[in-house]
Structures are given as C-alpha cells and as structure tokens.
C-alpha cells in the first residue's frame, strides 16, 4: 500500500480548549480518585451518540468509531506519560514519555478535525474515562502507577504503555478488518501512522524494560 503523508498544520490550535482536561485527570490518577466509569461502546453508537454516515460518503461508521475511540485511547496515554514527570527515575523513560505526550497531543487534534470535517461528534480529552478499549489501563492500574516512584514507576509505566500501544495497534487491525473501513485517504494514512509510530515505540520500551534493575 502506498501511503500519502499528510501534514500536521496549526490545527493543534483547535485542540487547545480541551488540553486542560488532561492534567486534571492525571492528577486524579495520582490520587486514585478517577471516579466511576461507564466503559461502553455499541455498534453505531459511540459515547451515547448515534453515528449517521451520509449516503455516498467516502467513509463508514467504523472509521468514525475508530477516530472517536482513538481520541480517548490517546488521552489516557497522555495521562500516563505526564505521570513520568514527577514519578519517573530513568532519564530515557522520561524522554520517551515526553515524546509520547508531544506526538499524541497533535494526533488528537488531527482526529478531532477529521471528525468535524465529516460532521461527526468530536469528543474531548476527558472522553477517555467514558470508555474502555484494547490496552487501556483500569482505574486500579492507574492508581497503582500514580502511587509508584522511581524504578517501580518506570517498570509499571513501560509495561502499561507497551500494553496500551499494543491495544492501539489492535484497534487499527480491527479497523481494516471492518468492511469498507480504512479506505478514506486521511483515515488510512493516520491509522497506518499509528501502527508505524507505536510499533517503533514498543521496541524502545522493551529495550528500556530489559535494562531496568531486577526487582
């Protein structure tokens, strides 16, 4: 498959209004007070919103669901990454966490922009606590990670983020297995970019995990 690289312009500005939700959720993860969650997603309905695709559109419901769910998936990854600023000990883990934060923020903006351009509901970053998907951490796992420090945090972060990234890759795989999905140009490029970037980061995290001192 030939991939066409899309640019990532100043659509990040579109995302600014929602950015503030992420640090506050990260703080709750540290304190363990993430609140109740309704982990649900139904075919044709995402976050309680019905998905209506116009006749003749170059995308299908699965594309919309993928974008909406991946926004939530990315948002939790950012919560995890920001915990490393205060909890991590390994400079390489901190470097990676910042890379994840800095790359997934604009990717959320790209997904929100895609949804708005197609007149679909674009959730904000707080949406991650409304759903549960492949690889996402539970409330208890986030609470444990938020309480950990130093090498213990690094290990939990790497194990958790490997699981999280693998879940994102599985979501892309499921997208392409859905009839007619993943064919719209921008959605196709974005989904493939997710696989490329997160596969590479999984390799980095596995190496870092192997370098940590034994328990």
Enumerate the predicted regions with their spans.
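Terminal or extended low-complexity segments
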Residues: 9-15, 96, 114
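Bacterial N-terminal signal peptides that target proteins for export
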Residues: 2-13, 22
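C-terminal segment of classical bacterial N-terminal signal peptides
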Residues: 17-28
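All-alpha RGS (Regulator of G-protein Signaling) helical domain and cognate RGS-like helical scaffolds
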Residues: 28-215
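Low-complexity intrinsically disordered segments
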Residues: 4, 17, 31-34
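Intrinsically disordered, low-complexity regions enriched in small/polar residues
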Residues: 6, 17, 41-44
């Amino acid at each position: 498959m030939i991939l066409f690289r899309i640019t990532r312009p100043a659509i990040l500005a579109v995302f600014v209004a929602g950015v503030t939700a992420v640090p506050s959720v990260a703080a709750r993860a540290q304190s363990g007070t993430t609140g109740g969650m309704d982990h649900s997603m139904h075919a044709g309905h995402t976050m309680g919103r019905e998905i209506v695709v116009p006749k003749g559109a170059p995308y299908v419901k699965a594309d919309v669901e993928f974008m909406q769910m991946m926004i939530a998936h990315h948002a939790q990854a950012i919560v995890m990454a920001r915990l490393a600023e205060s909890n991590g000990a390994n400079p390489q883990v901190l470097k990676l966490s910042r890379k994840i934060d800095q790359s997934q923020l604009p990717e959320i903006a790209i997904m929100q922009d895609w949804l708005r351009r197609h007149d679909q509901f674009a959730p904000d970053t707080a949406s991650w606590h409304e759903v549960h998907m492949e690889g996402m951490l539970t409330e208890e796992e986030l609470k444990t990670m938020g309480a950990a420090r130093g090498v213990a945090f690094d290990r939990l972060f790497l194990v958790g983020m490997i699981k999280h990234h693998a879940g994102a890759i599985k979501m892309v795989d499921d997208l392409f297995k859905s009839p007619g999905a993943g064919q719209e140009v921008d959605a196709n490029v974005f989904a493939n970019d997710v696989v490329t970037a997160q596969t590479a980061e999984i390799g980095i995290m596995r190496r870092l995990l192997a370098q940590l001192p034994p328990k």
